A protein has these predicted regions:
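Short beta-strand-to-loop acidic/aromatic patch adjacent to the donor-nucleotide binding site
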Residues: 87-97
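Glycine-rich, basic loop-to-helix element that forms the pyrophosphate-binding segment
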Residues: 67-84
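A conserved acidic beta->alpha catalytic loop
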Residues: 41-50, 96
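A recurrent flexible, glycine/aromatic-enriched loop bordering the glycosyltransferase active site
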Residues: 123-124, 138-156
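Conserved donor NDP-sugar-binding/catalytic core segment of glycosyltransferases
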Residues: 97-128
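Non-catalytic, C-terminal membrane-associated alpha-helical segments of glycosyltransferases
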Residues: 204-256
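Short, acidic, metal-binding catalytic loop of nucleotide-sugar glycosyltransferases
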Residues: 25-34
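Short beta-strand/loop segment that forms part of the nucleotide-sugar
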Residues: 35-44, 63-65
Length: 256
């Protein structure tokens, strides 16, 4: 980009104190390059607020007690977007680390590119299951139609986000966002040379729940059955197919 942009970082938080400290510490490294920080405290009952105020005392903080949307994460991002002023919107999960060179991806945000996501890697040191998941993630490259942008940490041009009307109250809000961008003539991409780490510990129960939710999301956006089947087989995610075929999509109230 030709000039230094104003960047607004939006981070929704729902009882994330187990991972939040590492996330905030890494984000602090690029504080002088960020225009504003917006933290959405979504029904937090832990020590998350104190951590945010300690590390970012001048940040904008919203304490949300009631959810009006079915997907509270999507609602949190929309709240942050509406109160932000930056030219670039950075969507940042609370359990993800910020690389020092994150802003190098700004060069990709030009012409018809609306959104750039960083490559997300699982922190394999967190647990044995995390280590297995770390290596399983490499199957994403063999998924039908190739690797697609994912959430966790991405930067978006404000003008593009405004054009598509912001976030929608759907199960997979960022997948829907990419669909909206394509319909508006924009592209979303992921860079492989800048990575961030997912700190959360995995469990079998969480993995199954995540796959079922992903299947419901694919059904909601009317993804073709053949593609869901290929995804489930090639990436070893059988419960995605179960969620797509047998679960209703109407009740998708989610928190971070």
């Amino acid at each position: 980009m030709s000039k230094k942009p104003f960047i607004s970082v939006i981070m929704p938080i729902h009882n994330e104190e187990a991972y939040l400290l590492c996330s905030l510490e890494s984000l602090k490294q690029i504080e002088d390059q960020i225009f504003e920080f917006i933290f959405i405290l979504d029904r937090c009952t832990d020590n998350s607020e104190a951590l945010v105020r300690r590390w970012f005392p001048d940040a904008k903080i919203v304490k949300k007690e009631i959810c009006k949307w079915k997907n509270s994460i999507a609602e949190n991002f929309q709240i942050g977007f509406e109160m932000s002023k930056g030219d670039i919107i950075c969507l940042h999960d609370a359990d993800v680390t910020t690389p020092r060179n994150m802003l190098s991806v700004l060069e990709e945000l030009k012409n018809d590119v609306a959104s750039v996501g960083l490559t997300l890697l699982t922190c394999k040191e967190a647990s044995f299951l995390n280590r297995l998941y770390y290596y399983w993630e490499k199957t994403r490259r063999f998924a039908p139609l190739g690797e697609e942008p994912i959430g966790a940490l991405r930067l978006i041009r404000r003008e593009c986000l405004e054009k598509v009307g912001g976030f929608k109250d759907v199960i997979a809000q960022e997948t829907q966002l990419d669909i909206d961008f394509r319909k508006a003539g924009y592209k979303s991409k992921v860079v492989t040379n800048v990575t961030c780490y997912h700190l959360r510990k995995f469990s079998f129960k969480k993995a199954v729940r995540s796959q079922i939710q992903a299947g419901k999301a694919r059904k909601q956006i009317r993804m073709p059955f053949w593609r869901v089947l290929g995804h489930a087989v090639l990436r070893l995610r059988p419960f995605t197919l179960y969620g797509y075929l047998f679960k209703k999509e109407d009740d998708h109230h989610e928190s971070n």
